[in-house]
A protein has these predicted regions:
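Pyridoxal 5′-phosphate
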Residues: 1-388
Length: 388
């Protein structure tokens, strides 16, 4: 049976060029980048070159890039180290109700330590109201962390306007750009972003590597203690093959390639919607009504059929999709994103699926998915009708 992967918001297959780069580095540049001998210098050159590529991708300075194990670590670092450094200036932190759990769980911890965390609501498009942010900002606000693109429904926050508002206050602005990086053009200077988190495995790079951009005016205390790597900001011997692979994945994403991907994903999304409508499937797009979305994610409420049934039957039919964030899907928890948008009693919470396109997705894949989903929905609704 052929298996079709439509869960690219969870992770992506590693690009062949990235694999080639990494295997070459594993064989040739195995030295410790902190060593002063030839092998160390060789590894350090790869590290510097890769860091420059990553920095250029968001219009940042090379020294502003802290290499991490991925966006989870980057988010924790930005939030917890800001709280540690600025606790004497204020205890208010602002975020949203639909952030990734690597933001929400540090927030819960900080609340237990006496911090005042404000969770901004979102509208039915999964976007905050700027007026709510403006009202929540106080002189005691030390950090605002709002994701750039949502991993479950694909909503895209008004980052430029948020940056402007935050910088009228005393707060720092952090954004989790994990889902947007690689699809959208990001400029940390233009958007007045102080800190930004990224993971390589969302852009056809390796897992367990990412970065945290930190504006050079901000000096966070070290997150991991030990050696003096990353200019004393994050201890631990750098993973040179992974860093080089990350940089290669970024190099592949030229502006023209990103534009082509956006156009392809928009076409796939339209194909799904038109096909399911033609097949008589009763569904709605979660977050519908917004023209500003991270284009590879499509979250749908399939009326009358549970998420579990849809996901299980699609898996049996050979399709990899998701009921929400891969980081919580194994727990079968209801989507906190859909609850924030529609309320915990909405049938959408228990009857929605997420599909997410990637560079290897084809029109034939989408056609096959629509046929399989149609068959599954019709079969289950007929079974329900027979029991009535």
């Amino acid at each position: 049976m052929e298996h079709i992967y439509l869960d690219n918001a969870a992770t992506t297959p590693i690009a062949p060029e990235v694999i080639e780069t990494m295997t070459t580095q594993m064989a040739q540049d195995f030295g410790n980048a902190s060593s002063t001998h030839f092998f160390g210098r060789q590894a350090h050159t790869v590290l510097d070159t890769s860091r420059h590529i990553l920095a250029q991708s968001i219009n940042a300075k090379d020294n502003d890039i802290i290499l991490t194990s991925g966006a989870t670590e980057s988010n924790n670092m930005a939030i917890l180290q800001t709280a540690q450094k600025r606790a004497n200036e204020g205890k208010r932190i602002i975020t949203t109700a639909i952030e990734h759990h690597s933001v929400l769980k540090p927030m819960a911890y900080l609340e237990s330590q006496g911090f005042d965390v404000v969770y901004l609501p979102v509208n039915a498009q999964g976007v905050i109201e700027l007026a709510d942010l403006k009202a929540a900002l106080t002189p005691e606000t030390i950090l605002v962390t709002i994701m750039m693109g949502n991993n479950e429904i694909g909503s895209h926050m008004p980052i430029h306007e948020i940056g402007q508002l935050v910088h009228e206050s005393n707060a720092w602005f952090h954004t989790d750009a994990t889902q947007a990086y690689g699809l959208l053009d990001i400029d940390v200077q233009e958007d007045q972003i102080d800190m930004l988190s990224v993971s390589a495995h969302k852009i056809n790079g390796p897992k367990q590597i990412g970065f945290l951009y930190v504006n050079d005016a901000i000096h966070l205390p070290s997150f991991l203690m030990g050696g003096e790597q990353e200019k004393k900001r994050r201890a631990g011997t750098e993973n040179i093959p992974a860093v080089a692979g990350f940089a290669k994945a970024v190099e592949l994403l030229t502006p023209a390639v990103k534009a082509e991907h956006r156009a392809r994903y928009a076409g796939f999304k339209q194909q799904v919607l038109e096909t399911l409508q033609a097949n008589g499937i009763n569904f709605e797009v979660n977050g519908a009504g917004s023209d500003d979305m991270v284009g590879h994610v499509l979250n749908m409420w399939v009326k009358g059929v549970s998420t579990y049934v849809l996901q299980m039957n699609l898996d049996l039919a050979g399709f990899a999709i998701s009921g929400g964030s891969a980081c919580t899907a194994g727990d079968l928890e209801p989507s906190h994103v859909l609850i924030a948008m529609y309320g915990e009693n909405s049938p959408r919470v228990a009857e929605s699926i997420r599909i997410s396109f990637g560079v290897e997705t084809t029109e034939a894949d989408v056609t096959a998915f629509c046929a399989a989903l149609t068959k599954i929905v019709q079969k289950n609704l007929a079974k329900q009708a027979g029991k009535a």
